[in-house]
């Protein structure tokens, strides 16, 4: 039974390892969507944020609602 347990543990680690690596490579807050993040980035000014993760922070700092269409324009 000993060797079987070792093999089972190794199998679990091998399956889980890629998922753990993916989670580590994407630190910081998660955006609702990349489109929303980019729109917020444009509203704040492109120079404010250069990376995807920083765009999320930029959107939060900017405190602006993402623009999705003409329906958001008053008087139209």
From Swiss-Prot:
It comes from the Eukaryota. One of its GO terms (biological process) is defense response to Gram-positive bacterium. The keyword Disulfide bond applies. Keywords: Amidation, Antibiotic, Antimicrobial, Disulfide bond, Signal. Disulfide bonds join 31-62, 40-58, 44-56, 49-59. Has antibacterial activity, mainly against marine Gram-positive bacteria like C.maltaromaticum (MIC=25 uM), C.mobile (MIC=12.5 uM), C.divergens (MIC=25 uM) and C.funditum (MIC=12.5 uM) but also against C.glutamicum (MIC=12.5 uM). Has very little or no activity against Gram-negative bacteria. This is Paralithocin 3. The lineage of its organism: Eukaryota, Metazoa, Ecdysozoa, Arthropoda, Crustacea.
């Amino acid at each position: 039974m000993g060797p079987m347990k070792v093999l089972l543990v190794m199998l679990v680690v091998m399956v889980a390892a890629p998922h753990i690596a993916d989670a580590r490579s994407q630190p910081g807050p998660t955006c609702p969507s990349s489109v929303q993040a980019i729109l917020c980035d444009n509203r704040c000014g492109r120079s404010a944020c250069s990376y995807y993760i920083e765009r999320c922070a930029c959107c939060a700092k900017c405190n602006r609602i993402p623009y999705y269409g003409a329906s958001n324009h008053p008087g139209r």
